[in-house]
């Protein structure tokens, strides 16, 4: 009898665990898409004071750049966009959630959000080390995120130091130097370690004025601090630079 009740108790606890933390993929998509609706409709007005604090703590984070980042995330987490992103993959629900360390960059506002999204949508537990350059907006977004999940979901954690800790997997973004540091301290975990990156643009001279305006945005958005900001141009011989200057300086 004792063994029977022990077995029933174990099954019940397992059920509670799965109910609490391992929602279905579609459940997670539905909740995450609600975040996008809130970000687009209410975030900028509801949290303008926090946005101003972020601009003071990091002068590179202007209200304009923060607004652009928030609206970009709201587009990213629309239900149709999430489904289009995930549809090419065969995704199985995890038998147990893994602890995934995310070491976030802070070069542009909320740059670590996509890593956070990737971990959550797969049903795993993010363990976040914030960048000192983006330690106002990201916790704010995460708290809003948690409010959308069931009240018993509390699987997002923050840490200040990775030394002496173990993780199932690691996602880091940093410099070539910091990559060596992370490789050493996270040597036993599965990992994605991003180093310095630069983006280039190759023009052949047939670009429309609209495309050139788009290129200007790719160069100057976020003051060029993003790894996807174009920092090098390849132009054909004899290219009329005034075509670029008209878009760059207007």
Listing of model-derived features with the role each one plays in the protein:
Residues 5-101:
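N-terminal Rossmann-like NAD(P)+-binding subdomain of aldehyde/semialdehyde dehydrogenases
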Residues 17-18, 149-233, 237-239:
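Conserved NAD(P)+-binding/catalytic subdomain of aldehyde/semialdehyde dehydrogenases
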Residues 138-141, 182, 244:
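Hydrophobic packing residues within well-ordered alpha-helices of enzyme cores
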Residues 52-59, 223-232, 249-250:
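Flexible, acidic loop-helix segments that line cofactor/substrate-binding pockets
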Residues 85-148:
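Conserved small-residue-rich beta-alpha loop and adjacent elements
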Residues 84, 190-192, 250:
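Short secondary-structure junctions
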Residues 29-31, 35, 240-250:
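Internal helical hairpin/lid segments
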């Amino acid at each position: 009898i004792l063994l029977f009740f022990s077995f029933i108790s174990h099954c019940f606890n397992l059920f509670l665990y799965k109910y609490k933390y391992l929602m279905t993929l579609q459940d997670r998509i539905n909740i995450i898409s609600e975040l996008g609706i809130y970000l687009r409709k209410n975030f900028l007005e509801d949290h303008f004071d926090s946005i101003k604090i972020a601009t003071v703590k990091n002068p590179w984070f202007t209200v304009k750049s923060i607004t652009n980042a928030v609206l970009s995330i709201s587009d990213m987490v629309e239900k149709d966009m999430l489904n289009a992103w995930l549809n090419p993959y065969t995704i199985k629900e995890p038998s147990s959630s893994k602890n995934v360390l995310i070491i976030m960059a802070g070069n542009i506002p909320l740059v670590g959000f996509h890593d956070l999204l990737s971990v959550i949508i797969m049903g795993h537990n993010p363990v976040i080390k914030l960048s000192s350059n983006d330690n106002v907006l990201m916790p704010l977004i995460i708290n809003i995120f948690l409010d959308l999940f069931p009240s018993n979901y509390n699987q997002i954690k923050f840490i200040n130091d990775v030394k002496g800790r173990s993780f199932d997997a690691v996602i880091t973004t940093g410099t070539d130097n910091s990559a060596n540091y992370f490789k050493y301290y996270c040597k036993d975990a599965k990992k994605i370690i991003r180093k310095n990156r630069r983006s280039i643009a190759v023009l052949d001279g047939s670009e429309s004025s609209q495309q050139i305006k788009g290129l200007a945005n790719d160069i100057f958005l976020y003051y060029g601090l993003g790894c996807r900001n174009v920092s090098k141009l390849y132009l054909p011989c004899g290219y009329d630079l005034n075509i670029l200057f008209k878009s760059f300086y207007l």
